[in-house]
Design a protein with these regions (language model features):
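A short helix-loop-beta submotif of the ANL/AMP-binding
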Residues: 90-96
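Conserved PLP-anchoring active-site segment centered on the Schiff-base-forming lysine
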Residues: 66-88
């Protein structure tokens, strides 16, 4: 679908400026993201917690690089978005999967968490848990109690949580989205949350996403791991992100009704 008019207008204005060199995300853009998270989800984060990225697939691989080594393990529910399944191997890690328990609820499929199987999947080499919320491809939204239990297991086993929440803006029927990092302060300190305007506003080709990393120790490891590997965020992507998160609330609300 077409992007919101405010995004098109912002891009047109930027194109009138003839210089397209490297550009660091501005303090204003950081503030716009912070305000968006507070406004839409009641999530209070600081500008310094935001790390901009060219995309969430690169962000997923960056997390593996930052927190795992060859032979270490990453956990993931299946079925799953294919890049999640490939990211551990890209970084010399092993993938351990736990299958969602499928059942029928009326005319719809239901996917439940097998906590016993999940807990058994942890070993001394477990380093990252890949949490997709809402889940791709099932569309499943995790409850607070489920995330608390998952988060506590990760804390117990010293496993970093990678929470990909790229579809969170598209919850239907007025259902609220609760970020994994809002479940508890302890879980927040153990979570890297990946988000982007790309799915919500149809701008994935502009290459602008971000990680929310509230623990400065984890954030430093992310910064160290990205050096020389992760490219700059696209200049036009930054413009689109700023417009999307500062001028398009009403457009998104109408989209969700539609």
């Amino acid at each position: 679908f077409a992007v919101p008019p405010a995004i098109s207008a912002a891009l047109a204005r930027r194109l009138e400026h003839p210089i397209f060199g490297y550009e660091w995300p501005s303090a204003k853009l950081h503030g716009v993201v912070v305000d968006w998270l507070a406004r839409r989800y009641g999530w209070q984060v600081k500008a310094e917690d935001i790390m901009f990225l060219p995309g969430l697939v690169s962000g997923t691989n960056l997390v593996m690089r930052a927190f795992g080594h060859a032979g270490d393990e990453a956990l993931c529910w299946t079925p799953s978005y294919p890049p999640f399944l490939g990211a551990p191997a890209n970084n010399g890690m092993q993938l351990k999967t736990v299958t969602l328990a499928e059942s029928a609820k009326g005319h719809e499929a239901r996917y439940d968490l097998d906590f016993d199987a999940f807990e058994r999947a942890f070993t001394g080499r477990s380093r990252v848990y890949i949490h997709c919320h809402p889940h791709n491809p099932t569309g499943r939204e995790y409850t607070r109690d489920e995330m608390a239990r998952l988060g506590e297991l990760c804390l117990k086993n010293n496993v970093v949580i990678l929470s990909d929440e790229i579809h969170c803006d598209l919850m239907l029927d007025g259902r609220p989205h609760l970020p994994m990092a809002m479940v508890s302060p302890e879980i927040a300190q153990n979570t890297v949350t990946l988000m982007a305007p790309s799915k919500t506003f149809n701008v994935p080709g502009l290459g602008c996403a971000f990680a929310v990393v509230q623990n400065p120790v984890l954030r430093k490891r992310m910064h160290n791991a990205e050096m020389g590997i992760v490219p700059h965020v696209n200049v036009l992507g930054q413009v689109a992100c700023e417009a999307a998160f500062s001028e398009c609330d009403a457009w998104l609300d109408d989209l969700l009704v539609y």
